[in-house]
Amino acid sequence: MDIAEANACAWAHGKSRLEAAIANRSNHAFETTLGGTTISRLLEGASKTHSVVMLYCGLDSPELHIARVKMRVAHGGHHISDEKIRERWDASRLNLIKLLPRLSRLQLFNNSVSVEPGRDIPDPVLVLDVESGRVNCPDQHDAAAMNAVPPWARPIVEAAIRGSRA
């Protein structure tokens, strides 16, 4: 089996496990880029029977993603094309905005800090916390907090504030 077949097989397996969890009304945790439409549609449907909680880690730019993938490949990890990374970087954030009203909770983290190999990696920074439609962080009335939101996350934070119940 070549790498493309292995990736397709792994994706199909993960999707079927998510579908089974939704059908069985059981808990399920998984990782996704949220870059396509299939998982977004499944999560939208799941929100009718489940509390969908999402921890979303984002980066400042597709170029930072590309650099991290190159580092991963250099250490034996799998490759993703630059074109695919750029497509997913935009699509993922748009899909998240569409899903916002369906999520029971969203915690959005900025994971853009880069460190030299061998150095401690700092924790991602919480940028947005929304629970039951209420924005807990950032405080939209605090100019410093709003200015601290990284540019890549601003459309998501703005959408959450527009849709906020409080």
What are these regions (language model features)?
Residues 1-47, 51, 83:
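Conserved nucleotide-sensing/catalytic segment adjacent to the nucleotide-binding pocket
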Residues 25, 48-53, 76, 102-105:
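Short glycine-/polar-rich loops that comprise or flank the Walker A/P-loop
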Residues 29-31, 54, 106-110:
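A structural signal for short, well-ordered beta-strand segments and their strand-loop junctions
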Residues 35, 58-64, 113-115:
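Conserved nucleotide-binding/hydrolysis micro-motifs of P-loop NTPases
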Residues 43-46, 68-71, 122-123:
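Short, glycine/charged-enriched secondary-structure capping and boundary segments
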Residues 44, 90, 97, 101-104:
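A broadly conserved amphipathic alpha-helix scaffold signal in soluble, globular proteins
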Residues 50-96:
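A glycine- and Lys/Arg-enriched "phosphate-lid" helix/loop adjacent to the NTP-binding pocket
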Residues 100-166:
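NTP-dependent small-molecule kinase module
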